[in-house]
């Protein structure tokens, strides 16, 4: 019985503290150990009990294990909601528990600061090469404004930001989205994204590690899928586009921000670009083939490179066909 396992899981002061911390943000097990002042193996045992009870969930990101409050459909109501209210009341009424939670939050603030410092140091190391590339592009603020306008007036709903990188696009769209999932293959980039997003409500966003050619989500999981400056890293862009189509619900949308076709060969060498931009005709063909109805693209000239914004609506009754096609291709392989 789950009620029994939940009550057992909460019958420990450390696990109560962990649950209060997770109400504020997702934390690595090592970060929890740092906040709680306990060894990592000991904290891991507490984490296992909370996860077994269904109160918390683990998520692997490279060699790190992150913990968050359970985000199942039932977590906003019933037993999970009752637990949240109980912990809030306990902190209000129990002075000793309240003092301990306040101390934990002070340590949590140090974790936030450390994440932001790590992000700043990373950008400082790569600033010169990124500045050279940015100098060729249309200003970021102009591109972001064009993306926001291209997505209006339809609600964003559940958003998947594929190749989230630093998390800037997830941050930009979070206010208008019901929930944001930022996906990236790089643990380093996910740490940068976490530093950027950590001040948003913890139930508003999550991060996931994965590849854009094999998205770790079920069909029709999202209302909006964004690929911002991602597809030029794909040797065969139709593969990530097929995956984006699979996870986008009928009636949803895909938004692609990328470079127009160009001939700057140095981007292959310095920045690992597999494709030197794209033509409108390429995207018209790819998006149509994957069940989208493209709108007219937006063109944003820069100082040597042109940025394009392509938005397309997902046509109905294509998800099942795409799933069958994907399964058939796996069998053939």
What do the PLM-derived regions correspond to, one by one?
Residues 2-42, 48, 63-74, 146-148:
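N-terminal helix-turn-helix DNA-binding core of bacterial DNA-binding proteins
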Residues 213-224:
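A short acidic, Gly/Pro-enriched loop at the edge of an enzyme's catalytic core
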Residues 223-236:
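A short SAM/SAH-binding and catalytic strip from SAM-dependent methyltransferases
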Residues 238-253:
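A short glycine-rich, Lys/Arg-flanked "PGG" loop and its adjoining helix->strand segment in the class I
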Residues 253-311:
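C-terminal alpha-helical "lid/dimerization" subdomain adjacent to the S-adenosyl-L-methionine
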